Each structure stands twice: as C-alpha cells, then as structure tokens.
Amino acid sequence: MKKFLFIFIFFNTPVFANGYDVFGIGFYDVKFDGSASNQATDFRYERRFGNTLFDIGPEEDNFFYLKPFAGIELTSDSASYIIAGIYLEDNLGQLFTGKESNLIFTPSFGVGYYDDGNGLKLGNKIQFRSTFEISYELKNKNRIAGSFGHISNGNLSNINPGVEIISFSYQIPF
C-alpha cells in the first residue's frame, strides 16, 4: 500500500501537470476464433502525462514524441493489473491529409504486475500490454475513444494464453 501511495503522489505532482485522465470500460478476453472465453468486464483508469520523455525522429513530426502513462485495470472477476509504459499520439487528419482533424491515434505499450484473482490465468505476474486507440476530441478538449489491446507475458512462462480487450473510454485533460 505504501508503494501505491508513493507512486500515486509522485505522479500527481506539478511536474506531471498536463495530459489526460482516462476512464474506460470494456470487454475482457474477447475471442475472434470461436474458442472458449472467460469473458469479464474490464474497468480501466490511466493517467497519461503530456510531457515527452525523449524525442526520436524529425522535430516537425510529433508522431515520435514518447510520453509516459501509468494506470490500473480491474475486471469483474477480480483480476487486477497495475501498469506503466509509454504512448504516443498523432492527429489522423494531419497524418493522412496534412490538415488537423478531431481524430487522434494513440498506440501504447506497457509492462506491469498482474494478479489473476478469480479470472483468467495468464501464467506469470509480469505482463505486457499493447493497445491501439482512436479517439475523437470534443470542443471542450475531452475525448471519447475506442481501443483494442492485448495482454501477454511474452513467453516468460510456459503458460501464455494472452487476452484481448475491447474498450471504450472518456478522457479528461488535466
């Protein structure tokens, strides 16, 4: 609990005073191949910080500005996942037509600690998550988004079923 409190206070300091709070809900363990599923509801909170960790690529192309995030995911079958990682975002209009639009593309990658609770057994406490998200920015700068993510232990153990998540989120700037 002390570690969680330290991390929470650290990431809420003025150094990290811009970005988005992301509140999401979705479908956990979505299967597209008809195989057995241990579906649950996925609840997610992330804090996406607006400060760039380091820049790679051309200066005029913000697609390469890597930014940190931290969050927690909980499922209706009591699994929990504490995660930290990097994300980037790019305006889809600017990416394809050169003109800004309200559509934002946000891929992310993170690593975290997973406790399966009564949920799906993913084979290891350490798990990796990759997510692709498209959001629509409203006039007040809030965003609504849909995302697809995959959690896996990257073959750190012999058991590695992985899990797919489809979720919807509401994002509020801070």
Model-inferred region functions:
Residues F43-R47, A84-I86, F132, F168:
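Membrane-embedded beta-strands of outer-membrane beta-barrel proteins
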Residues T41-Y45, P161-F174:
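Outer-membrane beta-barrel "beta-signal"
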Residues M1-G19:
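Cleavable N-terminal export/targeting peptides
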Residues D77-P107:
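Helix-adjacent hinge/juxtasegments
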Residues R47-N51, L88-Q94, Y136, H150, ...:
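Residue-level signature of outer-membrane beta-barrel architecture
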Residues V30-A40, I72-I83, T97, G119-K125, ...:
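Solvent-exposed loop/turn segments connecting transmembrane beta-strands
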Residues D21-K31, F63-T75, P107-Y113, G146-S152:
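Transmembrane beta-strand segments that form the barrel wall of outer-membrane beta-barrel proteins
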Residues D21, N51-I56, Q94-F96, L103, ...:
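Repeated loop/turn-to-beta-strand initiation elements of outer-membrane beta-barrel proteins
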